[in-house]
Curated annotation (Swiss-Prot):
Belongs to the alternative oxidase family. It comes from Wickerhamomyces anomalus (Yeast). Keywords: Disulfide bond, Electron transport, Iron, Membrane, Metal-binding, Mitochondrion, Mitochondrion inner membrane, Oxidoreductase, Respiratory chain, Transit peptide, Transmembrane, Transmembrane helix, Transport. This is Alternative oxidase, mitochondrial. Fe cation 2 binds at residues 181, 232, 287, 290. Residues 1-20 form a transit peptide. It is found in: Mitochondrion inner membrane. The lineage of its organism: Eukaryota, Fungi, Dikarya, Ascomycota, Saccharomycotina. The keyword Transit peptide applies. InterPro entries: AOX, AOX_sf. One of its GO terms (molecular function) is alternative oxidase activity. Catalyzes cyanide-resistant oxygen consumption. May increase respiration when the cytochrome respiratory pathway is restricted, or in response to low temperatures. Residues 308-321, 330-342 have a biased composition (Basic and acidic residues). Its EC number is 1.-.-.-. Homodimer; disulfide-linked.
């Protein structure tokens, strides 16, 4: 009898603990609007941004004007993976995969086996993606993606000052990348309002990632650019999944979203009638370009070679000189050094 009583007490204690944990952290795929938690990582969707969110008094002309992308070029963007060849490549690739797997587990996301093909439905499971979960994922991704370009540009800026010489146009492209990623984030936060816990994760993530990236870039900048190249591959994969979900009518709330003014002021080929899908297409196209740029920079001699995307050389054929803005590239996985005339 004593053993039976003890066993029941343990079961009751376990049930109480489980109910308490569910209160703190409801199921990631729960659609109950009243399901709240102090650890909620959901993002509230803003269909019609109120006028006070416009921030028009702070808007300036873009420091790096965005090129115009055609719908056809944006549709043609697809997931491409650069196979790791060196030990540094493998470390960078596995590092990105580890970070992504950890974030996927926390947010209840599962990567489709074929991001370019038909998606498997995970309705009714923790992997079902809702509009709120997608916004959380996009906001966190862009808060991280804006760090590497600025950190790398800062280090190269100091390097140029210290050695009293030019940096051969690396800084401009890196600053452009950081600015572009920040515009992605500024646009998303007009569409979604993240929870305080999501903001806390962003604060902590930026503090750790920015300092770690800074230290590694001082020692091995090539590894850092390769890491960012693989990170951008995952960004293209994520946005491709999002577009597929929109096309499959799994995210009906996004059909009613009115794009904020900041979006068409930056992407000049958008307007007030553009859809959320149009915006995601442009953002995915940007990420694909960052993928090409960083994989290419990782293939260069870090202290000797010019940045071929920004510093052009006359009389060099187009097939041997990357274009900084064109999406029609023969090497979306990055240019090898021998494919360019430096």
């Amino acid at each position: 009898m004593i053993k039976t009583y003890q066993y029941r007490s343990i079961l009751n204690s376990r049930n109480v603990g489980i109910r308490f944990l569910k209160t703190l952290s409801p199921s990631p795929h729960s659609k109950d609007p009243n399901s709240k938690s102090i650890f909620d990582i959901g993002t509230k969707l803003i269909v019609n941004p109120p006028p006070q969110m416009a921030d028009n008094q702070y808007v300036t002309h873009p420091l790096f004007p965005h090129p115009k992308y055609s719908d056809e070029d944006c549709e043609a963007v697809h997931f491409v993976h650069r196979e790791p060849k060196t030990i540094g490549d493998k470390i960078a690739d596995r590092g990105v995969k580890f970070c992504r797997a950890s974030f996927d587990f926390v947010t209840g996301y599962k990567k489709p086996k074929d991001v370019n093909g038909m998606l498997k439905s995970w309705e009714g499971t923790r992997y079902e993606m809702t509009e709120e979960k997608w916004l959380t994922r996009c906001i966190f991704l862009e808060s991280v993606a804006g760090v590497p370009g600025m950190v790398a540009a800062f280090i190269r800026h100091l390097h140029s000052l210290r050695l009293l010489k030019r940096d051969k146009a690396w800084i401009e492209t890196l600053l452009d990348e950081a600015y572009n990623e920040r515009m992605h984030l500024l646009t998303f936060i007009k569409i979604g309002n993240p929870s305080w816990f999501t903001r806390f994760i962003i604060y902590m993530g930026q503090g750790v990632f920015a300092n770690l990236f800074f230290l590694v870039y001082l020692i091995k900048p090539r590894y850092c650019h390769r890491f960012v190249g693989y990170l951008e591959e995952e960004a293209v994969s994520t946005y491709t999944h999002l577009i597929k979900d929109i096309d499959s009518k799994r995210l009906p709330k996004f059909d009613d979203v009115n794009l904020p003014e900041i979006s068409w002021l930056y992407w000049t080929d958008l307007n007030e009638k553009s859809t959320f899908r149009d915006l995601i297409q442009r953002i995915r196209a940007d990420e694909s370009k960052h993928r090409e740029v960083n994989h290419t920079l990782a293939n260069l001699e870090q202290k000797k070679d010019r940045n071929p995307f920004a510093l052009k050389v006359e009389d060099v054929p187009k097939e041997q000189q990357p274009d900084e803005y064109s999406l029609k590239t023969p090497h979306p996985e990055g240019w090898n050094r021998e494919q360019m005339r430096l």
